[in-house]
Amino acid sequence: MNKKIVLFGGQFNPIHTAHLAVASEVYHAIKPDIFFFLPSYMAPLKHHNTQLYSEHRVKMIQLAIKEIGFGEICTTDLDRKGPSYTYETILHLKEIYHNAQLYFIIGTDQYNQLDKWYKINELKKLVTFIVVNRETDNQNVSKEMISIKIPRIDISSTMIRNRVRMNQSIKVLVPKRVENYIKEEGFYGDK
């Protein structure tokens, strides 16, 4: 039987409770053999003016994995550097996991702009997209995709960075270990 591998890509700057809720819902719905957190080097459709060095984002993901009890980190995009095109990442993983069934998690925000993704038609042949709702209660997705409804949690990495900058609490917004790491390293404060 082919392995099922779920990929959860993102900047994770920082990883937060809403990310972990998505990971948990998908993990328990799909029951993959491997669940990869896939930190991007540079997401092609996002701005990067507050990006931490990748080793710090990886460290925060490692701390979050300890809290949720599952997951591994795939550093393919970080190792490659430059824009993190999902198509190139999937081709690389197909070389390693030849017959694996690959799943890639996206939110409705990304689902609504898939037409802008690099080589999207080829990518759709290589991976099954899992669309999690972040903007709407009901979503209609293409029949070759999987839709998973998750509880709406209005937390963003931008909000967390702003709260740190304004000396506001981020308790429960991020895992405790991640909160401690952010404080110890002095991330996101005025510099």
UniProtKB/Swiss-Prot annotation:
EC number: 2.7.7.18
Keywords on record: ATP-binding, NAD, Nucleotide-binding, Nucleotidyltransferase, Pyridine nucleotide biosynthesis, Transferase
A Gene Ontology BP annotation from the UniProt entry: NAD biosynthetic process
Reactions accelerated catalytically: nicotinate beta-D-ribonucleotide + ATP + H(+) = deamido-NAD(+) + diphosphate
A molecular function (GO) term: ATP binding
EC class: transferase
Superkingdom of the source species: Bacteria
Associated pathway: Cofactor biosynthesis; NAD(+) biosynthesis; deamido-NAD(+) from nicotinate D-ribonucleotide: step 1/1
Protein's job: Catalyzes the reversible adenylation of nicotinate mononucleotide (NaMN) to nicotinic acid adenine dinucleotide (NaAD).
NCBIfam families registered for this protein in UniProt: nicotinate (nicotinamide) nucleotide adenylyltransferase, PRK00071.1-3, PRK00071.1-4
Annotated family: Belongs to the NadD family.
Name of the molecule in the record: Probable nicotinate-nucleotide adenylyltransferase
Organism for this UniProt entry: Staphylococcus epidermidis (strain ATCC 35984 / DSM 28319 / BCRC 17069 / CCUG 31568 / BM 3577 / RP62A)
